[in-house]
């Protein structure tokens, strides 16, 4: 069961299928004890690239980021915690920052490469 939990959380991090189903499954898993999964820059850059290419809907990025940001069992390495926490906060709080566009995604990819 624990490996299934990790797989659901990892699938959400990689945004592998319908976002609604992934978020619901990840929220159910997050309520139970189990191992954490890591969010890293590579995973975020991959999702951003897929939003830029049109494979993923860039307008759903705030929902994805907010879901990940709220999960207790998603961890971020200390070296990446500042930039990825800021990314998740800004992406999930578009009312406080700018609307999500392809240009915003491209800027974040660049920023993560230099942070």
PLM ranges: what are they?
Residues 1-115:
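Acidic, Ser/Pro/Thr-rich low-complexity regulatory regions
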């Amino acid at each position: 069961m624990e490996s299934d939990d990790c797989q659901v959380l990892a699938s959400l991090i990689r945004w592998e299928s319908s976002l609604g189903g992934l978020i619901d499954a990840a929220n159910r898993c997050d309520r139970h004890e189990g191992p954490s999964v890591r969010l890293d820059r590579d995973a975020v850059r991959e999702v951003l690239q897929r939003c830029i290419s049109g494979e993923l809907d860039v307008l759903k990025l705030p929902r994805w980021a907010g879901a990940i940001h709220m999960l207790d069992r998603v961890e971020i390495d200390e070296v990446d915690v500042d930039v990825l926490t800021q990314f998740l906060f800004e992406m999930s709080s578009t009312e406080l920052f700018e609307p999500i566009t392809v240009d915003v995604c491209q800027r974040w990819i660049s920023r993560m490469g230099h942070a």
